[in-house]
Amino acid sequence: MFWTRLLSGIVLLAIALATFSFGNVFLAVPLWLISLIAYRELTKALKCATDEKKFNALEWIGFVGVTAYYATLFFTRDHTLLLMCIVALFMAEMFCYVAAFPKYQASQVMAAVFSFLYAPVLLSFAYLTRECENGIYLVWLIPVSYTHLTLPT
């Protein structure tokens, strides 16, 4: 178990080194893919996903929202549009809840929205940090601070 964790940590460090160093599309695409995976895992953990194998409408709306959010993040530098993506996702999730009322519970909709706000939006700040002035230096504070939090005391 230790060697598996060590090896995966080394591989992830190499990937982080490459993506953080190059930035731009080399950072945006892996973050988008990781965000999609993280969104799916969070929706499963929070019982938003009704089936382990298939996606429900709330998850599809979330996947489209994650993709729209990252497309907006990459192709524009307007933070107002990013906020509009978040609001649009919320409105779409609520519309789905109302349109298919007995099918979904309110807790599932809240879990879908929270999963979007927690994983994809949080991860996008690595890209935003990297793309700002002196971001090539500042972005390294993110994994360093995470390492500090996970080390045993």
Question: Model-derived features: where do they sit?
Answer:
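Membrane-embedded alpha-helical bundles of polytopic integral membrane proteins
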Residues: 2-146
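Conserved small/polar residues in nucleotide/adenosyl-binding loops
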Residues: 147-153
